[in-house]
């Protein structure tokens, strides 16, 4: 029957957090929920990034952040912070002060550090480059401008990106402006 629902989260310790006090439901409406382990998600990203590096292929993340506006940017943010772990750990205090949001991608980092003193900005940029050098090459949105698919959560939309890669024989654009075999996650 029609009525109101309350959405709650109960953590592992039993503490309850109300996520939404009142959600109107119509008769016959189906409500479902799911959960995901952040630990397992991050481990999965670590494995896939390492595998792309071992196979010398591009690493590419494909989500639907324009439609899945709550979940997919969070998934994207975890991928960004796993790939650039050293940067986010080393510069955590600075990023917190600047309001950097990993869910908005590497582009948010670039925007927020733009106003820092030149030496501090250069250090962060060098650390980003070190992560890129240590990891697999990234699938590029725009290789001419250095825009990776970890820059903005809505730049690579699975509905458009995957058919293109499949039609191209599993190849995507790399940092060198050339096509390369691609691991799609």
What is each stretch, according to the model?
Residues 1-77, 86-185:
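Extended, well-ordered protein cores
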